[in-house]
Amino acid sequence: MKVLWAALVVTLLAGCRADVEPEVEVREPAVWQSGQPWELALSRFWDYLRWVQTLSDQVQEELLSNQVTQELTLLIEDTMKEVKDYKAELEKELGPVAEDTKARLAKELQAAQARLGADMEEVRNRLSQYRSEVQAMLGQSSEELRARLTSHLRKMRKRLQRDIDELQKRMAVYKAGAQEGAERGVSAIRERLGSLIEQGRLQALTSQPLQERAQAWGEQMRGRLEKVGSQARDRLEEVREQMEEVRVKVEEQAEAFQARLKSWFEPMMEDMRRQWAELIQKVQVAVGASTSAPSQEP
């Protein structure tokens, strides 16, 4: 008989020990030390959950008034919004990254984000369930409910800690991919600028024949002007009018070429203007000599 009683006591003690889960300290995550908005929002949720887990008189009162679940709803929405915004910000910098890599990183980060959101929702739902259970007891002892809630919250905090660690890792990988994409974008810009500079150099080389044609045209015009200056004196007035028209055209065309060729054509234009002035002077001297000769005859 004593043996049976001893066996019964041992069985009961073993069952009690199996029901009581050993207290495991939850390591406080430090992922929000970098100060990103999504990490700060997550830290507010974590601190509030740690306060709820104390199940103090104030916590009990706010749980029964639905204030805790409402506050958790706001904290969850704020956290998920900040995570989404930060992810979108990193996606903008993933442009130059290969599409398959971008899709893989996005899928992994989305999965970590979904797990965290689901576990946060489960915490809120469990607290709402506790509120309903306490109200249904109608003044009876709720110690067993509080014990179960404490155990469940402890487990959920451990799961949330793993979710946070995983999300932190995925965010770090995503950020590294964004930085790599930004560096590739800068390299592409540098290559593009180098190509444009090379194109400009080639265009400068190909524009040299145009300068040579303009110079030949100027030489041709000077030859024509010299030929006009040697014509007969009775056509002097006509020659002057033609020379004036030619001068106007030459100046207009010279200005057009000067705008297109800029510094290349300016030295040649200055030379043309100088030779033109010398030619006019020669013509005027010749004309003056021809008009003074008859007046000196007896």
From Swiss-Prot:
It comes from Cavia tschudii (Montane guinea pig). The keyword DNA-binding does not apply. GO terms for molecular function: cholesterol transfer activity; heparin binding; phosphatidylcholine-sterol O-acyltransferase activator activity; phospholipid binding. This is Apolipoprotein E. Residues 95-243 are annotated as: 8 X 22 AA approximate tandem repeats. Heparin binds at residues 155-158, 217-224. It is found in: Secreted; Secreted, Extracellular space; Secreted, Extracellular space, Extracellular matrix; Extracellular vesicle. One of its GO terms (biological process) is acylglycerol homeostasis. Keywords: Chylomicron, Endosome, Extracellular matrix, Glycoprotein, HDL, Heparin-binding, Lipid transport, Lipid-binding, Oxidation, Phosphoprotein, Repeat, Secreted, Signal, Transport, VLDL. APOE is an apolipoprotein, a protein associating with lipid particles, that mainly functions in lipoprotein-mediated lipid transport between organs via the plasma and interstitial fluids. APOE is a core component of plasma lipoproteins and is involved in their production, conversion and clearance. Apolipoproteins are amphipathic molecules that interact both with lipids of the lipoprotein particle core and the aqueous environment of the plasma. The modification Phosphoserine is found at residue 141.
